Curated annotation (Swiss-Prot):
Species in which this protein is naturally found: Pseudomonas aeruginosa (strain ATCC 15692 / DSM 22644 / CIP 104116 / JCM 14847 / LMG 12228 / 1C / PRS 101 / PAO1)
Protein name: Uncharacterized protein PA0525
TM region(s), chain numbering: none
Lineage per the UniProt record: Bacteria, Pseudomonadati, Pseudomonadota, Gammaproteobacteria, Pseudomonadales
UniProt-annotated location(s): Cytoplasm
Keyword Membrane on entry: no
Length: 612
């Protein structure tokens, strides 16, 4: 019996692979992933005028009401198709493409979709709008025509045969083929009951997403995210909200003798299992829709106490009532006045401290090194009076006099004190992601603390005015501004104690922090004012401050800082920084530190370079 079962499973597995391979319309050997094309696609999209703040994300295959062949119905394939869409905020491309038998054609299809999206506008009529965008793109860039022709020719060979289509479907198929071959040549398309075979070269209407979760949902999602990391794709799913069944209001609506029959098909209020399904993540990958419960309790839930603000007796010490700051809403294209409350704070329990022992040797070397760069006295040549004779000027004067010149000589060298004309504000991102471990002993926050301490030691020896601050946030009403050292405060044990008392915070409302830093730095009298930002990720917060909204607000804050004559510069350890920091700070406005442990050393190297 066991052998028969194993044989049946073996035959079934081989039959499944055989039938799906012959019925599938994809070519696995030529599959190309979006992740491998993400950077060049972003460059293409922005080079042709696409908004820099638009996110490039993966989207799952979409279920379409297609007319499938008998073999496809038997195999259960071709129910979903990889389609692309663009809604102005994000460009959604398939997680992978295998629609062509050649990998290069699949890469070319990715490039075409990115270029088409850069030319796209609001989608009102699927076929007419895609024709218009394609025609505009090909007219503006004739060099694209051969590439587009290759994609169309390869796709037309894969479309259903006209002989196998009903009359109405065949009429639509002819119109689509003509529209693909000659964009703009077809104005009217016949109506049919089923969707036409997918057109991977066109953009489809965007998905209708359910409203974002409430604030409470956001906290629970953030708390649950830290429990366990499951390997999964980057594609987003469509979602719908459902009401969770309440196990406390069960009502017996059936007779017990029917328990195993029709009762199983009734929409009864049954309680759910409290344990997490170990196969849930795998099953979710195969679903088109995810049903999201409004139930506040979690299955197998754990607590993330660090996501909630601590009690006042244990929280950091607030300094004053807080400051109201504006925030940029890119949808309305205006600043929302007094939208954010920034609370200055100091770490609780911070006491005067000396430099940690593991930094003493490095600090001594840096103090000596930066002391050599300390501003001293500058020598001015050809002065009418001074401390010593300028020999070069005297020789020039003698030559001119013998030639008959009568230039009034400036024969002296004068030494004057060199004015320090640079002020620097160092702003550190203290979000919860800094709690991540670099190795078995050190965290990201430890590297940031070392960077702040060594930066203070070096600039104290150099003599440049500087200030140290940190920030994190919990929604717009709680942007926590850690005051470590003001410009008018000396660097010493008190400042070291505050830095050593730092701990990972919450989220990253970067725009508000940059605006406050610009206010502080803008009040300094120095001609050159440098704003350095230490960061480890994108701007994000609980209340819609993520994605393009957070990116655009941060960019606007950087623009405001530059308009005040400040020089903002970001130093990051985020390996994906190249995807968004050029838009925020410019191509030369940021530096990536590959290893977080090298942050202290690289910070001071960059400061020396920027100081010149």
């Amino acid at each position: 019996m066991a052998f028969a079962v194993e044989l049946e499973e073996w035959v079934g597995a081989h039959w499944h692979r055989f039938i799906t391979r012959h019925a599938s319309g994809e070519f696995e050997a030529a599959r190309v992933t979006l992740e491998s094309m993400r950077r060049p696609l972003g460059m293409l999209f922005r080079a042709l005028g696409g908004a820099p703040g638009v996110a490039l994300e993966a989207t799952p295959a979409r279920r379409l009401l297609l007319r499938r062949t008998w073999l496809q119905r038997v195999a259960g394939t071709c129910e979903q198709a990889p389609v692309s869409w663009f809604n102005g905020d994000s460009l959604r491309l398939p997680e992978s493409l295998a629609v062509y038998p050649q990998a290069e054609l699949n890469r070319e299809l990715y490039r075409w979709l990115a270029l088409l999206a850069a030319s796209a506008g609001p989608l009102r009529h699927w076929a007419q709008d895609n024709q218009r965008w394609a025609r505009q793109l090909l007219d503006a860039y004739p060099a694209l025509r051969p590439r587009y022709a290759r994609l169309v020719a390869a796709h037309l060979r894969q479309r259903p045969s006209l002989d196998d289509c009903p009359a109405a479907d065949a009429e639509l198929e002819i119109a689509l083929r003509r529209a693909l071959a000659e964009p703009g040549s077809v104005e009217r398309f016949p109506r049919v009951e089923r969707a036409p075979w997918p057109v991977p070269l066109w953009l489809y209407p965007g998905e209708r997403w359910t409203p974002s979760a409430s604030a409470e949902d956001g906290e629970e999602a953030a708390a649950g995210a830290g429990k366990r990391q499951v390997a999964r794709s980057g594609a987003r799913k469509r979602a719908e909200r459902i009401e969770e069944r309440n196990s406390e209001r069960n009502l017996l609506l059936f007779r017990l003798e029917s328990l195993l029959s029709w009762s199983e098909h009734l929409a009864l209020d049954r309680c759910s299992d409290d344990e997490d399904d170990p196969d849930g993540a795998r099953v979710a990958e195969d679903l088109d829709y995810l049903s999201l419960s409004r139930q506040r309790t979690q299955k197998g839930g754990g607590l993330r106490l660090d996501l909630d603000l601590p009690a006042a007796d244990y929280d950091d010490l607030p300094l004053g009532p807080g400051l109201k700051l504006p925030e940029w809403d890119y949808r309305q294209q205006r600043l929302l006045s007094d939208h954010v409350l920034l609370q200055p704070m100091r770490p609780r329990g911070a006491t005067s401290a000396s430099l940690p022992a593991h930094l003493e040797k490095t600090a001594l070397h840096l103090r000596r090194q930066f002391a050599c760069l300390r501003d001293g006295r500058q020598r001015l040549r050809q002065q009418p009076q001074g401390d010593e004779i300028d020999l070069d000027a005297w020789l020039d004067f003698q030559v001119e006099r013998r030639r008959g010149g009568s230039t009034q000589p400036g024969l002296f060298l004068e030494q004057r004190p060199r004015r320090r004309d640079l002020a620097c504000l160092l702003l550190a991102d203290l979000s919860m992601s800094t709690e991540a471990y670099l190795d078995d002993q050190r965290r990201v926050i430890d590297s940031i603390v070392d960077s702040l301490l060594l930066f203070g030691e070096a600039l104290q020896a150099l003599g440049d005015p500087f200030a140290l601050y940190g920030f994190s946030s919990v929604r717009r009403q709680q942007v926590r501004w850690q005051v470590l050292k003001d410009f008018d405060e000396g660097y010493g044990g008190e400042v070291r104690g505050r830095v050593l008392a730092l701990s990972p915070g919450y989220y990253t409302r970067m725009g508000a922090a940059i605006r406050r830093a610009s206010q502080v730095l803008g009040g300094q009298p120095q001609k050159r004012r440098l704003l350095l930002l230490l960061s480890d990720g994108k701007p994000n917060d609980l209340d819609r401050y993520e994605g393009r909204y957070g990116i655009e607000d941060t960019r606007q804050a950087v623009i405001e800082a530059r308009s005040q004559g400040l020089v903002p510069f970001c130093i990051t350890i985020d390996k994906e920084a190249a995807d968004y920091l050029p838009y925020l700070f410019g191509a030369d406005g940021f530096a990536l530190v590959e290893r977080a442990g090298q942050l202290p050393e690289r910070l001071l190297q960059l400061y020396r370079r920027l100081r010149r």
